[in-house]
Regions:
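Short amphipathic alpha-helical coupling segments at ligand-binding clamshell hinges
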Residues: 45, 187, 191, 260-272, ...
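Periplasmic-binding protein-like
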Residues: 127, 157-165, 191-196, 202-203, 233-259, 272-294
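Extracytoplasmic ligand-binding site segments that recognize negatively charged/polar headgroups
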Residues: 32-44, 62-66, 72, 80-217
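Extracellular/periplasmic bilobal clamshell ligand-binding domains
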Residues: 297-331
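Bacterial N-terminal signal peptides
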Residues: 9-20
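Short alpha-helix C-terminal cap/hinge motif
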Residues: 44-58
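A bilobed periplasmic-binding-protein/Venus flytrap-type ligand-binding module shared by bacterial periplasmic
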Residues: 130-137, 175-178, 249-261, 280-284
Length: 331
C-alpha cells in the first residue's frame, strides 16, 4: 500500500510539474504581439502598449499596394506571423472574406459609432487626404480655396501626388471628388485634365509625397495632413478648402484567425482602441480618429469636415486605374 502511494505521489508531482511547464510556456508564448499595418509612424503607440502591458509589440509596415497579396500569401502558406492586422477597410473586408480575420469584438468598440464595427472588423479612423503645401514658398493668397484650384496652370510642375493609375487610395479619393465635390462628371473630368496638364510628380504612395514639398522641389501635393505632425518642424500646412470635405478611406483592424498569440492580440486591440491610445495616435502621429472629441494637433482640424469615402471594388479600382493612366499619360 505504501509503495502504491509512493508511485501515486511521484506521478502527481510529475503531472503538476508538467502542467507548470506548460503554463510557463504558454505565458512565454504570449509575451509579444505581431502587428501588420499600412499605417506609418506608430512607434509611440507600440512603445506605450509595451510599457502598459509588458507585452512586446512588433510592428511590420506593409504598403497598401502590397498588403493584400503579402498577407494572403503568408496565410495560404500557413506562415502568417501577424496577430493583429490593420489596413484600409476594403483590404480588411477582402481578408475577412478569405477567412483571415476573426470575429473578435473589443469591449472598447462600445465607445465608437455603431457603423464602425463590422463583424470583427473595427474602424478606428479615416485615412484623410487633402492638399498640403510648403508655407514658406506658397503665398497665403495663392493657397487653394477649392480642390478645383489645383488645376490652375500656375501649379504646373509644382505638384506631387501618388500614382493615380496604381495607388488604390488615390484612385478612391479621385472618385470621392466626383461623388462628393463636383457638380457634374463633366466638371470633374475637366479638373482631371487640368491636373494632368500641370504635370504632377507621381510617386508610389502617400509616404514619399511630403519630402519634395518639404525640400522645395515641389510646392504642393495631394497628400495626408498627418505629415504636418510627423514631419515637424518641416514648413508644411494644409489648404482649408471652403465648404468642401477632407475625404479618406476608413482605417480598420482585426485579429488574425491564426494569430500565434491570440490573448496578446486581444490585449493589443483593446489597448489600441482605448481613448488614451487614440489620443496618442492623434497627438503623435497626426491621425484623424473616430473617438469622440479627439483631434490631431493641426490648426483648424477640429472644425474640418472629414468624411469616409465609399469602398471601390477590385474591378472599379482596375477600371479607373486604367482610365487615369490614359488621362495622366502614364507610361
Amino acid at each position: 500500500m505504501n509503495r502504491a502511494w509512493r508511485w501515486f505521489a511521484c506521478f502527481t508531482v510529475v503531472v503538476l510539474a508538467a502542467g507548470m511547464l506548460l503554463t510557463d510556456g504558454a505565458k512565454a508564448a504570449e509575451d509579444k504581439v505581431a502587428f501588420y499595418a499600412n499605417i506609418t509612424a506608430v512607434e509611440p503607440i507600440m512603445e506605450a502598449f509595451t510599457a502598459a502591458t509588458g507585452i512586446k509589440g512588433e510592428y511590420t509596415r506593409i504598403s497598401t499596394a502590397k498588403f493584400l497579396s503579402t498577407v494572403f500569401t503568408e496565410f495560404e502558406a500557413g506562415k502568417l506571423m501577424a496577430d493583429v492586422i490593420q489596413a484600409p477597410l476594403p483590404v480588411l473586408e477582402m481578408l475577412k472574406d478569405k477567412g483571415v480575420i476573426s470575429d473578435y469584438v473589443s469591449p472598447e468598440a462600445a465607445a465608437y459609432p455603431e457603423w464602425a464595427n463590422k463583424n470583427g472588423i473595427q474602424l478606428f479612423g479615416i485615412e484623410y487626404v487633402g492638399l498640403i503645401y510648403n508655407k514658406e514658398l506658397v503665398k497665403p493668397e495663392d493657397v487653394p480655396k477649392r480642390y478645383q484650384d489645383l488645376a490652375d496652370p500656375k501649379w504646373k510642375d509644382k505638384i506631387v501626388m501618388a500614382n493615380p493609375a496604381s495607388h488604390a487610395t488615390t484612385i478612391g479619393w479621385l472618385i470621392g471628388l466626383k461623388e462628393h465635390v463636383f457638380a457634374s462628371e463633366e466638371e470633374w473630368r475637366d479638373f482631371l485634365k487640368g491636373l494632368a496638364a500641370n504635370n504632377p510628380m507621381l510617386v508610389a504612395s502617400f509616404g514619399p509625397t511630403p519630402a519634395p514639398i518639404e525640400s522645395g522641389e515641389k510646392q504642393i501635393g495631394i497628400s495626408m495632413p498627418k505629415y504636418i505632425v510627423t514631419k515637424a518642424p518641416a514648413p508644411l500646412d494644409w489648404a482649408r478648402v471652403e465648404n468642401q470635405p477632407l475625404m479618406g478611406t476608413p482605417r480598420a483592424m482585426g485579429i488574425s484567425t491564426k494569430a500565434p498569440h491570440p490573448e496578446a492580440a486581444k490585449k493589443f486591440m483593446d489597448y489600441w482602441l482605448s481613448k488614451g491610445a487614440m489620443s496618442l495616435l492623434a497627438a503623435k502621429v497626426g491621425e484623424y480618429v473616430l473617438t469622440p472629441g479627439v483631434f490631431p494637433p493641426i490648426d483648424g482640424m477640429d472644425n474640418a469636415q472629414v468624411i469616409p469615402i465609399r469602398e471601390l471594388s477590385d474591378d472599379e479600382i482596375a477600371t479607373w486605374g486604367e482610365e487615369f493612366k490614359k488621362i495622366f499619360a502614364i507610361q
